[in-house]
Amino acid sequence: MTYHQLCARAFAALYLGLCAQAAPAASAADEAPAQPAPTVTANVTVASQYVSRGIRQSWDKPALQAGLDYVHPSGFSAGTWASTISDKFVESGTIEWDIYGGYSGAVGGVGYSALLYVYRYPSAIYRATGTKYHYSEVALGLTYQFLYAKYNRTVSRDFFGIPDARGTGYLDLGANLAVGGGHTLNLHYGDGRVAGAGNGIWDWKDGKIGLTKALENGWSVSGAYTKARGASNAYDIYTLGIPNRSGAFDVANVARGTVVLSVTKIF
């Protein structure tokens, strides 16, 4: 799940909470309080580009993103999310499709979560090794007030087109701090370690600072600066090694610092 997903889900929770507060109180004549009902929310985002864990996946092009989330009062949840991507970054791929579900709760003031994520890239395959880009992760998370920590661990054999990378880990530390006027300051630090012999060249770290503004009727806007740094130059001169129509190779620094702007609508 990406920065935009996290912002969309966090804003959805805020939006639903405000709606609940605005609802009329139950009358004293009611025999029993109504049981909390499951919630279903949808979100649509238009972003200036798609950056996931500090890496630019839409090759500097705009991205269209959408998701659907179901949350049960017991703490169980499930959802799906998709984004356009570039086939210059993912060979023969134009869509990332995520499916996820799990459980979350709280003890005292500390929140916790355990979820399974399945990432699908229809038709995408890195033909040099015959490896598909699909992979799966288990994510364990903790939250306290505006702080959060999450660790994702790859449980599939391969990781994003990299073969034999089971055990790849990504540590996500951050904060979403309300600063008044409907604004939230978004801070993030990430550390990715790719498992498997020789795969350490794909290790990376990334950081982000952003600001999200909640608007009326489920709308929000956000802006962020994000940057990554790889353990090698693999991200600085990233290429699939496939000649384009002119016979040249498409090469880009997918880790360089960049600004991402987005508009999100929660339904």
Give the role of each language-model region.
Residues 1-39:
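Cleavable N-terminal export/targeting peptides
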Residues 32, 90, 197-199, 232-251:
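Solvent-exposed loop segments that connect transmembrane elements
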Residues 40, 74-80, 108-114, 146-151, ...:
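Repeated loop/turn-to-beta-strand initiation elements of outer-membrane beta-barrel proteins
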Residues 38, 60-64, 93-97, 110, ...:
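Residues that define the transmembrane beta-barrel architecture of outer-membrane proteins
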Residues 46-52, 72, 82-86, 105, ...:
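Transmembrane beta-strands of outer-membrane beta-barrel pores
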Residues 67-69, 100-102, 139-141, 172-176, ...:
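Outer-membrane beta-barrel architecture
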Residues 28-86, 258, 264:
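Short glycine/proline- and aromatic-enriched beta-strand/turn motifs that initiate or cap beta-hairpins
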Residues 209-219, 225-227, 250-267:
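Outer-membrane beta-barrel "beta-signal"
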